[in-house]
Each structure stands twice: as C-alpha cells, then as structure tokens.
Amino acid sequence: MAGRHALVWLRADAPSQALTPGAQPRLQAWFAAGFPAVVARRDGAEQPGQVRLGVPLPPAQGKQRIALCAQVSDIARSVPALALPEVISHAPPQWQAALHALQAQATAIGMQPRVFGSFAFQAVTGLPYVHAASDVDLLWTLDTPTQAHAVVTLLQQWEHVTARRADGELLLPDGNAVNWREYAGDAQQVLVKRNDGCRLLPRTALFPERCAA
C-alpha cells in the first residue's frame, strides 16, 4: 500500500464520500476533473482494506482539506511524492532560481528530495497553489545520521541564502519520519510520524543500528 504523501487516482466509477462536513460536492467535482488525492495518516477509523486520503483544495477554493476513506481496490494509480525536478517547471518564476539551487545542492551531497504539499499539487493539477510566501514541503529518504546532518545543514544554508522556507520530513530507515527542523534542534525526544499515528521517541532511537554498534 502507498505510504503517506503518495498521490493516488481513484477509478472513475469508485464511490467516494467526504468525511469533512459539507464537502461532498467539491470532492465529486475534484475527482471528476481527474485530480488525485494524497495518502494521509491513518486514524483507526478505517475499515479493513481502506486507506485514508486527503484532498487539499487550492487557496482560490478556501484551502480546505477534505478527508475521505477509499478502498485500496479502488485505486487506479499511485505514485510517490514527486521528485523535485518534476515540480520546478510548474513553480512560480520567483521560485525558480531557489529551487534549481536546491536541486544542485542536493545532488552534490548525493540526495534527491521529493516534494509534497502545495508545490506538488500545483504541478499535478495546474491550479495555483504556490505564492511568494509559500513553504516548499520536502521528503528526504535517508539511512544514516550523517545523511540527516548533511540535509539539515543544506536546508539551513539554503534558507539563509535564498530567503525561502523549507518544511518537510526526514524519512527514516524504518519508514517513519521526523520533521527536519525538529531534528535540527537539541531536544532529546522528537515527534516521530508513522502511517498510523505519532509518538515521541528518544533521538537515539532514530537510527538503532548505529546506536547498537
């Protein structure tokens, strides 16, 4: 099953029922336009064989986030969060230089971030989500604390130089994730996000193999 931040398209005949009150007409119009939903964190209310999804509407439609559950069997197609090069050409002109710099710097340290959130949905729908003050949401898949440190250093320097802001997560070897900015802090415990919830864990538990060595 696709993990959090993956984009999914439902079959044209798949039933969909908004869990967000009053949002059913907008949800139907969204899927009728051929747009995807994003896989969200499970909350325990899903039935067997279901996945929790979200549809974040653009600012022109109130930025409402519509929640729904769908049968896994009704998913026609799914893709991971988009690679950064896939979204750069769809970003506003004032973002282009900063994103190209981010891509070059990530390549230089051997990392390839993926993008979710407003930049991803602007890329896949063509609708205007991003503005000058937006954050770019990045997902970094990594295996070691050394990689995590390199990503944090890169992002801190990139924000300082470009005056842009990056949000997002470090995807840990076990498939869980932690906010990069929280990881960059000095707290002994960090909030770890899982597909089925969140919990506080000691920083030393994030890379257990290294700790055991």
UniProtKB/Swiss-Prot annotation:
Function: Transfers 2'-(5-triphosphoribosyl)-3'-dephosphocoenzyme-A to the apo-[acyl-carrier-protein] of the malonate decarboxylase to yield holo-[acyl-carrier-protein].
Known EC number: 2.7.7.66
InterPro entries named in the record: Holo-ACP_synthase (IPR017557), MdcG_C (IPR049180), MdcG_N (IPR048903)
GO terms for MF: nucleotidyltransferase activity
Protein name: Phosphoribosyl-dephospho-CoA transferase
Coiled coil: none
Entry keyword annotation includes Cell membrane: no
Keyword Transferase: yes
Keywords: Nucleotidyltransferase, Transferase
Source organism of this protein record: Xanthomonas campestris pv. campestris (strain ATCC 33913 / DSM 3586 / NCPPB 528 / LMG 568 / P 25)
Catalytic center residues: 135, 137
Catalysed transformations (reactions): apo-[malonate decarboxylase ACP] + 2'-(5''-triphospho-alpha-D-ribosyl)-3'-dephospho-CoA = holo-[malonate decarboxylase ACP] + diphosphate
Family membership noted in the UniProt record: Belongs to the MdcG family.
